[in-house]
Amino acid sequence: MMTTAKTFAEFKTLTDTEDYLQFFGIAYDQGFVNVNRLHILKQFSKLIEEVDAAFPTLSETEKLEKYGQAFEEAYELFKTSSPLETKLFKVFQEKPKDVVFLKDLTK
C-alpha cells in the first residue's frame, strides 16, 4: 500500500498536539499529552526555529523530516523533565517580586 507524501501545506493546517503526532506518525500516550500539550508545542516551536535557522536550504520533504524529529524530541523531553525544569514559559523565568530568597540573605 502506497502512502502519499506529506506536504508543507498540510503541515501548516495542523493545530493540536495530537494533529502533529498523527501527521509525523509518532506513537503517544493521550494522558501524557493532556498534561504536557502546551509545553510540547512551545518546545517544538523553539526547535523548528532552530531547524529553519540551521538548514535554510532544505527541500520541503527534508524540512518536514527535520520537523518530525524536532516534534519527537519535544515530546520525549517532557518524559524526563518537568515544565518547571525546562522553564519554557515566561512565568517560570521571572523572579517573583517583593520576595527575598534565603540565599540572598547570606551574601
Swiss-Prot record:
Gene Ontology terms: biological process: nitrogen fixation
Pfam families given in the database record: NifW
Keyword Transit peptide: no
Keyword Ion transport: no
Assigned keywords, A-Z: Nitrogen fixation
Subunit relationships: Homotrimer; associates with NifD.
Functional note: May protect the nitrogenase Fe-Mo protein from oxidative damage.
Family: Belongs to the NifW family.
Entries under HAMAP family matching the protein: NifW
Name listed for the protein in its UniProt record: Nitrogenase-stabilizing/protective protein NifW
Species of origin: Gloeothece citriformis (strain PCC 7424) (Cyanothece sp. (strain PCC 7424))
Lineage: Bacteria, Bacillati, Cyanobacteriota, Cyanophyceae, Oscillatoriophycideae
